[in-house]
Amino acid sequence: MNKSEKRNVEIVLNAFDILFNKRDYATAERFWSPNYIQHSAHIPPGRDGLFDLVKGLPATLRYENHIAAATGDFVILHGRFSGIGLPAAWVVADIVRMEDGILAEHWDVIQDEATREQS
């Protein structure tokens, strides 16, 4: 990764930590574009849709990142959301397009975490 790509990864990881783990919505607004485009079938449109979804999730929600990479303006994450109020945690691949140092667009693939017996 070049310097710009590394910086984009740092920004996205920090943004995810602030929104999902710390639930600091005022600070998180600085990381997400007001014109944020959401392509997930699981998340309501826009920045407000994402923030409202998180506000409605249990306080036990946690995001753990396992893999982070970038190419150009795109950051790709593989991580785990736990404490979501469901029997299984979610394993998620997120793709974020950055624009002017903020999160501008998002795609994801979500699946229930398999147990050891299921793997």
Predicted feature locations:
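C-terminal and inter-domain tail/linker signature
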Residues: 1-119
